[in-house]
Amino acid sequence: MKVTFLDSPEMIDRHWPAVESLLGPSVAELARGEFNVDDLLTMVRCNRAFAGLVESEAGPVLALVFEFRYYPRCVALHVLALAGKRLSEAAMTFWPVLQCLAQEFGATRIEAHAGRAMSRILSGAGFKHQYDFLKFEINQEV
């Protein structure tokens, strides 16, 4: 399997359709209106987020968009979107590469907001449930 990070405008143009095809359905279902794949593309083009793609001989198998979050006492690679096919097989190749990249950028952890199914998958990769993420929608009438 081959890991590619979309780190130039040419790489984005060449590989984004594959990233979009893998992420599109899960982003539409799980992002709950916070962002869509077009927003992710804009973030990647502006260097606000980064995209990665894992491909096998048969084609794309895993896509990821992430950003770095700078907390007062640590840096985290924050997964915005992750989807694919044959995830456990792809993760064997991708996971060590992602960890090295995170360390190169000064991150000491990788974090993700994930639905239940992805949480189960990520738990198998060593992720631990840290806390529950809550939201409160502010309406316009205050």
Please identify what each model-predicted range represents.
Residues A112-R116, R120-V142:
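Active-site/acyl-donor-binding loops of N-acyltransferases
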